[in-house]
């Protein structure tokens, strides 16, 4: 089974929108291999519109000419990804990423290009044309590129088979499929068809569904057909969004397990929005970034870095390479909140090996606050604790206590 632990990597969206190019992907991959890989970071993911030759930002150019082959399958734009020229697709770039010991991922939109349907291009491996399988009534509300498919037709599966076999030939390890996770009920069958094509392509590919919020009542369906799915709309560097994530995390945490992970979205840390401002930087304070990383790790969300890695400062690099905090993702089980109020939250997660607990304390208020979990709440006798951000060792008398500045967090290994 793939995705036995939450996937960890980098995604180009937060820093480059639709405009990332091959040199940028390569430099981020090289940085990951040198500075992050040893800590568990491994996926390098090219986000939306890699097939659009003139993309420049997070905005979409309406009805732009897209790069695709004779079967209506999108291809990397050679002007942005030079190694793809001559029909090579993403294979040369994926080969480079693999040569670093990393894994390569791409973003796709559900469906097929509208251009492919309008031009009546054939579907590889069957007798139907794209125009016969495309559903013009199934379109994305925020991107103009695609039509959904008539998934009651076997030729819809043939189209998805053709693109996933191509991704497998390229060496793709991760596919983020967009405009689908929150589109229940009308995209339920399309999720199943995409998942089946992904699993039948001959290569292990992690399937991630976006955007959120995915409906909680569809949790079992999502767990059956995807490896991760978004529980929120796009998450950005705003405190109100981070504070709101505590409610979502509480609802979804029980569904986190090997092979399927509720996804709280990317980590907007470091250098963001580079397509607009080369000096762009996260609006989160250092305290808020600790809170975000602590919550994501406690709920065992996938971790995808959103910033331009080569511009990481010392704080950002240390935030992303704290072995003890990152270990929560791989060694804990059954994480859940003890409580969450307007002003504070406390989470607990036993280690799978039974050797102790992780305890996270959060100050959600606008002033310094002391947050305490009593020994009775821990449901056991524990005498020692280590705070994982600072390394401070504590002797416990009755529970765990931390005095935290506004929007800050502490996380303890208790034994």
What positions do the PLM features span?
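Aromatic-lined carbohydrate-binding/catalytic grooves of carbohydrate-active enzymes
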Residues: 32-96, 100-168, 172-184
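C-terminal beta-strand-rich structural cap/linker in extracellular carbohydrate-active enzymes
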Residues: 396-415
């Amino acid at each position: 089974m793939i995705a036995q632990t939450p996937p960890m990597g980098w995604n180009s969206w937060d820093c480059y929108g639709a405009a990332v190019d091959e040199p940028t992907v390569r430099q981020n991959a090289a940085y990951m291999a040198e500075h992050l890989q040893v800590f568990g970071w491994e996926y390098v993911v090219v986000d939306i519109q890699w097939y659009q030759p003139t993309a420049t930002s997070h905005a979409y150019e309406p009805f732009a000419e897209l790069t695709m082959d004779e079967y209506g399958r999108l291809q990397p734009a050679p002007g942005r990804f030079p190694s793809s020229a001559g029909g090579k697709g993403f294979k040369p770039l994926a080969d480079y990423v693999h040569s670093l010991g990393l894994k390569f991922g791409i973003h796709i939109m559900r469906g097929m290009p509208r251009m492919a349907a309008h031009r009546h291009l054939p579907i590889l491996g069957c007798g139907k044309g794209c125009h016969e399988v495309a559903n013009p009534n199934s379109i994305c509300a925020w991107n103009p590129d695609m039509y959904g498919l008539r998934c009651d037709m076997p030729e819809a599966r043939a189209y998805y088979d053709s693109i996933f076999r191509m991704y497998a030939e390229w060496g793709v390890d991760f596919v983020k499929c967009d405009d689908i996770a929150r589109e229940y009920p009308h995209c339920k069958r399309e999720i199943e068809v995409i998942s089946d094509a992904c699993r039948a392509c001959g290569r292990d590919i992690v399937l991630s569904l976006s955007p959120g919020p995915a409906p909680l009542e569809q949790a079992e369906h999502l767990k059956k057909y995807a490896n991760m799915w978004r529980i929120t709309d796009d998450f950005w560097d705003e405190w109100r969004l981070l504070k709101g994530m505590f409610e979502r995390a509480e609802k979804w945490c029980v569904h986190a397990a090997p092979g399927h992970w509720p996804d709280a979205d990317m980590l907007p840390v470091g250098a963001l929005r580079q397509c607009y401002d080369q000096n762009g930087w996260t609006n989160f304070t250092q305290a808020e970034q600790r809170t975000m990383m602590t919550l994501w790790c406690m709920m065992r969300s996938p971790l995808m870095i959103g910033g331009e890695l080569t511009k990481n400062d010392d704080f950002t690099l240390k935030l992303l390479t704290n072995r003890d905090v990152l270990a929560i993702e791989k060694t804990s089980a059954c994480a859940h909140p003890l409580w969450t109020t307007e002003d504070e939250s406390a989470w607990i997660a036993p280690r799978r090996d039974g050797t102790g607990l992780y305890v996270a304390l959060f100050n959600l208020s606008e002033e310094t606050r002391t947050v305490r979990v009593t020994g009775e709440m821990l449901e056991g006798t524990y005498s020692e604790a280590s705070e994982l951000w600072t390394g401070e060792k504590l002797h416990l008398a009755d529970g765990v206590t931390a005095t935290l500045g506004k929007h800050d967090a502490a996380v303890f290994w208790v034994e």
